[in-house]
């Protein structure tokens, strides 16, 4: 039976389902520790399942009965779920929307850095502790609600040493950013690597993102090994 994480037994089930997993083994336990009493997060556990809900999207570690999972997600008003296809059967009746591939770089390894436009690169300013709101606006320029949610989550993690973010600025504008948005369980989950549209294809994103990673721990971000996560939705808006 899937139940809200409200007891020590539920918490133990949740953490056991996450143990040893790439990305989900870091992000879900940290989110539970930081946001278990905050909206819009909700956390549930089954005998072999950890489930995090935020808005209409769910993240699952472990596995559950497909019929039970589909019924539970419908009850919670979820429209999509991200899960490890090698471990968790999709909810009954749901269709795959896309495949998300997670890459990992082992400790001590480095990325080959692509060539960047030297003139452009020389005119950029490197920000090691950029404003959380500046980063939020760069990532979600047209969505103030997402900006506010991103800002709140990043500030909460940053103040506890659980996230690092870097940015490149061209004059006063943030034009490239990447971050380790979860630092937990010897993993550094790198995400939200993005370059402003007019400057893409000039090598600055690859040069910048490839040159940043926290020290120590596996970095589930770049090639060495890979894990495929599937995103499924109830309406089957696409296939992959």
Annotate each predicted stretch with a short phrase.
Residues 50-120, 226-231:
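Acyl-donor-binding surface of acyltransferase catalytic domains
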Residues 33-54, 162-178:
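Conserved beta-hairpin
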Residues 149-194:
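A conserved beta-strand-loop-helix scaffold within acyl/acetyltransferase catalytic domains
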Residues 65-72, 195, 201-215:
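Conserved acetyl-CoA-binding loop-helix of GNAT-fold acetyltransferases
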Residues 228-240:
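…primarily DNA-binding HTH/wHTH and HhH modules…
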Residues 1-26, 110-149:
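Short amphipathic alpha-helix that is part of the acyltransferase structural core
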Residues 190, 212-216, 223, 228:
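Short hydrophobic clusters on alpha-helical segments that form packing/core surfaces
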